[in-house]
């Protein structure tokens, strides 16, 4: 399955000057919501991701996503894996488990995002779950921006990666684009970074 083509066909691979939720600036932005607005395509992508996870023989009892960006991807992945789905969300900028969602002690959970950049949001989600007694077994995403190490990829983890090295990250593709710290972003000389989503929007 050509994941890059899926994003291009959905007009979800944007070019410009963007402020990513990680805080980095980039000339490309992946808008997964445009890809996931097609239920059939969302199902196909989730099945592809589920296949990777099943081949790793992991025991997963639940999928959890940080709102909002990860919810559609996480729900479809949970459906493909045949497990339940929950999500965390920010309240006053603090990641929280609400809406009556509960986790069992030692429940094996995969944290799923639509896009993994540094993995900061995924780790905030994982921390909430671990504090409630859950056991995080893996991370998942439709796409990985190449900072975190993806299972079955030759690319190594880069500076700024937040995901723990002892847990696998399953994703369908690495999208490696230039990313810059705001203090050294060459794009800022000619334009202002815009933020299409998701954190804080």
Swiss-Prot record:
Write out the residues that bind 5-phospho-alpha-D-ribose 1-diphosphate. 113-121
User: What UniProt keywords apply to this chain's record, in alphabetical order?
Assistant: Glycosyltransferase, Magnesium, Pyrimidine biosynthesis, Transferase
Q: Which Pfam families match?
A: Pribosyltran
What cofactor requirement does the entry state? Mg(2+)
Q: Provide the coiled-coil residue spans.
A: none
For this protein, the Enzyme Commission number is 2.4.2.10
Q: Which SUPFAM superfamilies match?
A: PRTase-like (SSF53271)
Could you confirm whether the keyword Signal appears in this record?
Answer: no
Q: Which cysteine pairs make disulfide bonds?
A: none
Biological processes, Gene Ontology terms: 'de novo' UMP biosynthetic process; pyrimidine nucleobase biosynthetic process
Can the keyword Nucleotide-binding be found in this entry's annotation?
no
Task: Give the record's pathway.
Answer: Pyrimidine metabolism; UMP biosynthesis via de novo pathway; UMP from orotate: step 1/2
Q: Which GO terms describe its molecular function?
A: magnesium ion binding; orotate phosphoribosyltransferase activity
> What is its quaternary makeup?
Homodimer.
Q: What does this protein do?
A: Catalyzes the transfer of a ribosyl phosphate group from 5-phosphoribose 1-diphosphate to orotate, leading to the formation of orotidine monophosphate (OMP).
Q: Which NCBIfam families match?
A: pyrE_Therm
What family is it from? Belongs to the purine/pyrimidine phosphoribosyltransferase family. PyrE subfamily.
Q: What is this protein called?
A: Orotate phosphoribosyltransferase
In the UniProt record, the gene name given for this protein reads pyrE
